């Protein structure tokens, strides 16, 4: 299946839910493209929220998407880092396709042992991402994977974590980018968005 066919098929899974989770927001469900909690004033009603979970009702599309991403980065990266929680859905599949390690980027307090952390500002407060010390090594080229790019805060924190280890962010891959929010402007590395709204 070519890229345009894949994009078209995934795009058809998007569902819109007016006034969800609050009045004035249009929630679009993609059966797995993200249930992101953003405050209403940061989103235009046209953008709404995106949910990638419906995509998982079509396992062949999930596999095709992950193979597409793996082919784009073959021989260019050494490791895939997935952001909690939905980066865990795509990242391991991409890493398996490439035969390279996957590292989970977890929220604070969920990893045992020595950790490295980076904080970031969310719409409703501060949050922290962590990786275990030794999970990434200096010089490794890393693909950071998440389902959605909105304001860029979580991906920026993940970039900071990778940088602290001495590894390099090769690119950030997201299934969906909410382009009007300009989240890519806060990121130091390339953003590869499969779909942009």
Predicted regions and their residues:
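PRPP-associated nucleotide enzymes
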Residues: 1-197
